Amino acid sequence: MADLLTVTGLTIVRGGRVLVQDLSLSLTRGAVTALTGPNGSGKSTTAWCLSLHDRDCTGEIAFEGVSAADMSPRSVRALHRRTIALQPQHLLLEDSWSVARNLRHAAWSLALPWRRRSDLVSEVMARTAVEDLARRRVDSLSGGERMRVALARTRLMREPGLVVLDEPTAGGDEGLSALVTGMLDEWVGSAAGVLVVTHDQRLVERAEHVIRLGDEPAA
């Protein structure tokens, strides 16, 4: 199967500090790749770059054979609406809004058909077990509940080609871990490629491929 995303010589520098140097990798459809390593090794920043949200990195990134350097801003926005689903570390949630309003807004931002938005929001809320939280403000939720809402937001994209998750089991319990594992299986089953930034050994063991940043020794 052809590579979904290829990276050659990725280097990331922030504040004069080299976070990632000369990283090369490839992501394929129908597989989970775990990105792990110690805190401060650049995992989250790497995920942000690979999802094409951060262009302030050097090296070559190509999505389905097209260089990111050759993509127009409009093309990148289209990928973010229809093809690249991202759950970043800061979760992309508006704290002062209710859970339902956050998800409705996310459905609108993905340019989903108006008539389908309500049904789709209800569907993903049920899938991620946040129906009972619909009217609660995000800033009243626990860490695990917030993560479930963030996963629901990510799940709104119906047929992503690439899914990028940053610490999706952080602050959660066994139920959240089981939810994430099930969602990984669903995405892989629909031929999406998944990149998951994680310290969770269960997700590392679930992955077909593991990339370690920093000085963490290989298992």
Residue ranges of each PLM-predicted region?
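Q-loop/switch helix immediately C-terminal to the Walker
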Residues: H90, D95-S109
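Conserved ABC ATPase signature
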Residues: R137-L141, E145
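Helix-to-loop junction immediately C-terminal to a conserved catalytic motif
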Residues: S51
